[in-house]
Amino acid sequence: MKKYIITLFTIIFISAVSVAETSELKDNFFHSLENFFDSKFDDTDISIKSKEGNKPEIGIKTFKPLNDTESEITFFQGSLFTHDERETLNLGFGKRILSDDESFLYGLNAFYDHELDYDHQRASLGAEIKSSILELNTNHYFAISNEKTGKNNIKEEVADGYDIEIGAHAPYIPTAKFYTKYFEYDIPGGSDFEGLEYSSKIGIPNTGLDFEVGYKDYGNNSYEDQWFFNLTFNINKMNSNTS
């Protein structure tokens, strides 16, 4: 299991990064990753996301409990995504606590994003509340890096922003959820990037597969509305159902 996950990380990462410029970073990353995987990761997803008019995004995300009790959990979450010849590493920690009456779960988290190719960096703080039928999530994003020269020598800068999302379980379908998200980013020197995102997600029982389809509506902004589709494989669920 450990070797399989590490191999997937290696394939995704090496396929699109410059060996000459990032060899030291890759060596350090995979050395740390292998040491971290000495304790088993049970909850790891591989995803393929396709957006209308854009190249697909491929990613791997893993969730590891660090301290798990009946009433709370502290966890590490890490992911690596590649899209349009750009690789982004995301690392963070969070804590979730079960309410005294066990009717809802609430939590806080903090993450760090690093786009490896052009050295863009940002931090985020998030909060969540979940019950058996509803959930509310919000994230606030803060730029760390300054303006950089990106792909095709275009000047790029990380944007500050936030999003807030509400989700609901579909009646009589335990693995189905519906989401509505509002997002807004402050684009330096340009129009704000804002809009609404509508999506639905369903898990296929006993397969480890989740399907998500959604639509981004940018309102009257200069951005084009777009559909997106996401397919996710959960490694632990696949293994548990085939063993």
Task: Kindly give the residue locations of the regions a language model identified.
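Residues on the lipid-exposed face of transmembrane beta-strands in outer-membrane beta-barrel proteins
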Residues: 60-64, 91-95, 110, 125-131, ...
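Transmembrane beta-strand segments that form the barrel wall of outer-membrane beta-barrel proteins
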Residues: 42-50, 72-82, 105-115, 125, ...
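Flexible, glycine-rich linker and terminal segments associated
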Residues: 21-37, 144-190, 197, 203-243
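Classical Sec-dependent N-terminal signal peptides that target proteins to the secretory pathway
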Residues: 2-20
